[in-house]
């Protein structure tokens, strides 16, 4: 993580105190690695995906931070920031009622490249986590559904929400994350702009862009693409940008 040299990081598919990841608070580990005091984890489910899990109830925390670090083992998305966070936000995006067969990587005993296998995957609840920063930006992390059509509906809802928060907080919105949509679809027929064009999946030979930095307004000339780095900890490549 340190090699990313970032002030703000948005991550998806994060474990929070799950047995498969040695009961670690992975968000705190990430925040510590980049020197971030402010971090938040937004669970999408309680339990382990693909194994035993349940949807959140009214008794479960929707946003876990350093001052509310109490929750059962969960899985979701997170933001860590070295820039002070003024306010955290959460939006429920729902999930597809049907799953899909997906091609997923598994470790290979004979090659450095993962083996590929197809499995049927049920869609989990999706959400967005926002952080209004002290520098005039609101960054919003998400991981949209892999089901075609459902992800477009979720993104439309997310964009409306992002603009609403931007107006309320007098900040500029930035949507980050795995949108599960190929090139240009996230910005088609909209005023949103994709700040970086970079294939991100799979990490061992990226052929398609699923991950994006989206902004609303004329900020493209203030962005420097810092290039991607193969971290070895994900099947996606991270996008890195410097925004003035």
What are these regions (language model features)?
Residues 38-44:
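Surface-exposed patches in mature extracellular/periplasmic domains of secreted proteins
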Residues 1-8, 17, 21-22, 32-33, ...:
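Active-site regions of metal-assisted phosphoester/phosphodiester hydrolases
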Residues 14:
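Phosphate-group recognition and catalysis centered on beta-loop-alpha active-site segments
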Residues 25-28, 34-37:
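Short acidic, glycine/proline-enriched helix-loop-strand junctions
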């Amino acid at each position: 993580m340190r090699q990313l040299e970032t002030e703000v990081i948005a991550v998806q598919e994060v474990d929070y105190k799950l047995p498969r990841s040695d009961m670690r608070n992975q968000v705190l580990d990430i925040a510590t690695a980049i020197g971030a005091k402010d971090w938040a984890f937004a669970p999408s489910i309680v339990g382990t995906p693909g194994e035993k899990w349940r949807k959140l109830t009214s008794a479960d925390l929707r946003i876990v931070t350093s001052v509310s670090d109490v929750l059962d083992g969960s899985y979701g998305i997170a933001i860590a920031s070295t820039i002070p966070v003024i306010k955290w936000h959460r939006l429920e995006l729902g999930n597809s009622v049907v799953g899909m067969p997906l091609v997923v990587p598994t470790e290979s005993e004979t090659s450095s490249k993962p083996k590929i296998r197809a499995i049927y995957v049920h869609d989990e609840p999706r959400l967005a986590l926002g952080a209004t920063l002290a520098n005039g930006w609101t960054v919003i992390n998400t991981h949209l559904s892999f089901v075609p059509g459902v992800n477009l509906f979720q993104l439309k809802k997310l964009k409306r929400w992002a603009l609403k928060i931007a107006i309320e907080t007098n900040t500029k919105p930035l949507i980050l994350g795995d949108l599960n949509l190929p090139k240009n679809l996230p910005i088609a027929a909209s005023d949103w702009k994709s700040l970086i064009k970079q294939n991100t999946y799979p990490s061992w030979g990226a052929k398609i862009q699923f991950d994006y930095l989206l902004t609303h307004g004329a900020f493209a000339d203030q962005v420097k693409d810092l290039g991607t780095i193969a971290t070895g900890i994900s099947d996606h490549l991270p996008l890195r940008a410097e925004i003035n």
